[in-house]
């Protein structure tokens, strides 16, 4: 397959070549990671007849690509299409335009006997039968994507380096267009992002595109996308600053949580002269705006138990002192949790009250951006007021942050307001919530991410979205080293017998390393350093079946079907003889679970 058109296109997508049978899951993970960092991937996700796939690939190269990723998965040697068609195309494109077209090899083959190195000879060895020139791939830079194994192999991901190099190359190629120091970044949170323009309102020639996949059930971004955003965002921000970007324009549509994360990542204190958010109506909400007149004011309200709203008694637009906020929200009680909703007149009271109840009946503060209307009809907030409103709302949140250790925040206002407000809140610890579907037509606020200062990423935590299986479990299997006895408040105890042998115990694997001995109090004490790994063995999920495992195994795995003994019962001698209940941890989604060891840990409350 040849093309008369040059393969390189500075803002074109990045082609992902992979073996469908053995590499589809890793390819989706790579795609998700790159999308979260501003790069648009191109991969054919359908298992079609060869002719159709070949036409799709040909079209992709003819339209122009900015780079390619060759994924080496265990099983790629069985592929015919990758070594015969895609690999030669990628190598040819790189040779034709080495500066404009980057080729990255992501290697999942571990070097024999090494805990963290990849087998650099794998490209040639795996593809040489059907691609005689495959050995030249060994000379290309290879990045690691290694899962842990039962032989001491550690999990290693260098996708951050792949993203860094792709961003750096793209910004270098587009430097003539970025000469004024301004960059355009398209945004999209939709069910199935692809390599095509988001829609007619997202300009296809934007320099970068951040796209998060939307969960079909909850209608909010998927947990895996948030976790990839957590790692990708600091890489993106570092490259923007390295390219001396001074003005950022975001455009398109997205959920408030993405807008909040971007605002925290580019706070007013950083070297950004102008931060602009172009909404889906083409209005620019700029950090430098000064409105000709003000029609939107800030009203501080709370919710009564029946869901009705009640003003806190402060004059509109007044920013109360910390002492005034304390009295209004907590009275004489100590300031703990607080639920905050940034709204633009519209809100759903019941999900807010349900969230407050979960947080030990925390007070609810509604920061309502009310736009006056002479005739009583709905009037939209003027975009030129956004910067000033964001600054004042940020001041209110900072005063709340001085009182409560943690703010629980949701936004029911334009996404631009979430971003402009967040730029003044990068020093606060905030748990952000999205209003999502939970089934049976019920809407509730779902905690999705945490932002706080002083860390490598503005997103310091992503919360699990796995569906609990408590209602589905009909049988429990004990996989701990000992019998587990349940002591109910009334009735006879019940015991789950221990497995027959230790090969069935679900335990966290570990590697040991002898260190120099401690010399204390005239004694020499040996010291062993323990490196924790994944759990093994891993029982297969089965409908209606739950597993009782050690607590540390449940915390490591984050599976919805893992339970552990909780609420200890002690015998007369003081030893533990059973439990009062079973415990479980928040479960990560099915897409996250295989990659949790390569991502940041679940935050602790």
Which functions belong to the PLM regions below?
Residues 1-67, 90, 98-99:
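Conserved N-terminal substructure of TIR/SEFIR domains
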Residues 559-569, 573-574, 581:
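Surface-exposed interaction/ligand-binding surfaces
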Residues 74-96:
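Conserved TIR/SEFIR loop-to-helix hotspot centered on a Trp-containing motif
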Residues 116, 143-150, 154-472, 477-483, ...:
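Long, low-complexity, Lys/Arg-enriched
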Residues 68-70, 100-107:
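Conserved beta-strand/loop subsegment of P-loop NTPase cores
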Residues 19-22, 47-52, 74-82, 256-257, ...:
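Acidic, metal-coordinating catalytic cores used for nucleic-acid/nucleotide bond scission
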């Amino acid at each position: 397959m040849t093309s008369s058109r040059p393969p390189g296109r500075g803002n074109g997508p990045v082609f992902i070549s992979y073996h469908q049978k053995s590499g589809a899951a890793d390819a989706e993970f790579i795609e998700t990671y790159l999308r979260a960092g501003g790069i648009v991937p191109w991969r054919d996700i359908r298992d079609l007849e060869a002719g159709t796939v070949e036409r799709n690939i040909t079209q992709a190269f003819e339209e122009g690509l900015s780079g390619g990723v060759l994924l080496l998965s265990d099983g790629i040697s069985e592929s015919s299409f990758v070594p015969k068609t895609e690999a030669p195309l990628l190598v040819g494109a790189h040779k034709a335009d080495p500066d404009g077209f980057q080729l990255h090899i992501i290697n999942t083959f571990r070097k024999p006997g090494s805990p963290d190195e990849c087998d650099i000879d794998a490209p040639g060895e795996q593809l040489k039968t059907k691609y005689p020139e495959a050995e030249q791939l060994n000379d290309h830079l290879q990045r690691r994507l290694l899962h842990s194994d039962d032989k001491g192999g550690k999990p290693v991901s260098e996708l951050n380096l792949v993203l860094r190099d792709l961003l750096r190359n793209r910004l270098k190629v587009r430097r003539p267009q970025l000469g004024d120091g301004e960059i355009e970044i398209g945004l999209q949170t939709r069910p199935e992002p692809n390599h095509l323009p988001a829609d007619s309102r997202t300009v296809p020639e934007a320099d970068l595109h951040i796209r998060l996949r939307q969960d079909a059930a909850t209608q909010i971004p998927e947990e895996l996308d948030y976790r990839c955003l957590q790692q990708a965002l600091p890489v993106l921000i570092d490259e923007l600053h390295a390219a001396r970007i001074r003005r950022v324009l975001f455009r398109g549509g997205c959920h408030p949580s993405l807008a909040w994360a971007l605002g925290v990542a580019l706070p007013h204190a950083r070297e950004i002269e102008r931060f602009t958010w172009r909404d889906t109506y083409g209005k620019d909400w700029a950090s430098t705006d000064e409105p000709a007149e003000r029609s939107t004011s800030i009203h501080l309200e709370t919710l009564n138990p029946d869901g009705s709203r009640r003003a806190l008694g402060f004059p509109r637009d007044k920013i109360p002192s910390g002492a005034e906020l304390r009295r209004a929200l907590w009275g004489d009680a100590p300031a703990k949790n607080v639920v905050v909703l940034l709204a633009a007149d519209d809100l759903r009271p019941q999900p807010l009250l349900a969230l407050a109840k979960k947080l030990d009946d925390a007070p609810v503060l509604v920061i309502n951006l009310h736009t006056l209307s002479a005739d009583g009809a709905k009037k939209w907030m003027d975009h030129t007021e956004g910067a000033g409103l964001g600054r004042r709302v940020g001041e209110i949140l900072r005063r709340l942050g001085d009182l409560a250790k943690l703010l629980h925040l949701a936004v029911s206002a334009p996404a631009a307001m979430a971003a402009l407000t967040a730029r003044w809140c990068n020093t606060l610890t905030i748990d952000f919530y999205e209003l999502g579907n939970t089934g049976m037509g019920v809407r509730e606020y779902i905690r999705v991410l945490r932002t706080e200062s002083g860390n490598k990423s503005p997103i310091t935590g992503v919360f699990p979205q796995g569906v609990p299986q408590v209602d589905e479990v009909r049988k429990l299997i004990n996989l701990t080293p000992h019998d587990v006895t349940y002591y109910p408040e009334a009735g006879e105890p019940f015991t789950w017998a221990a497995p027959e042998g230790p090969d069935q115990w679900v335990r966290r694997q570990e590697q040991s390393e002898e260190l120099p001995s401690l010399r204390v109090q005239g004694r020499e004490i040996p010291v062993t350093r323990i490196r924790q790994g994944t759990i093994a063995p891993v029982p297969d999920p089965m409908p209606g079946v739950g597993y009782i495992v050690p607590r540390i195994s449940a915390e490591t795995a984050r599976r919805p079907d893992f339970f552990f003994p909780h609420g200890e019962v002690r015998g007369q001698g003081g030893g533990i003889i059973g439990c009062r209940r079973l415990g479980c941890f928040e479960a990560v989604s099915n897409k996250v679970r295989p990659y949790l060891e390569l991502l940041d840990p679940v935050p602790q409350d």
